[in-house]
């Protein structure tokens, strides 16, 4: 069941505008306009990481199944355990990460 949920989520991510993917840190990572915003674990089928603004990250961490992700990476990432979080809820966090990445992309082009 975990796989099916993750596949559904990946499919939704792939269809967002300006999204591309490449492997990074053992994750299948997706970027929006060149800024990474989500990664799907290749080791287990229930872990995803999402890049968020500091405020939104703090909001996310208060939820069941969500914790800070700091695998040698910069702060600003969360890890979601898909065994504890509904796909629809996870996708809401993914969309927040996507919008954050698009905002970062616009800032770096100024």
Residue spans for each PLM region:
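Charge-dense, helix-prone N-terminal extensions
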Residues: 1-110
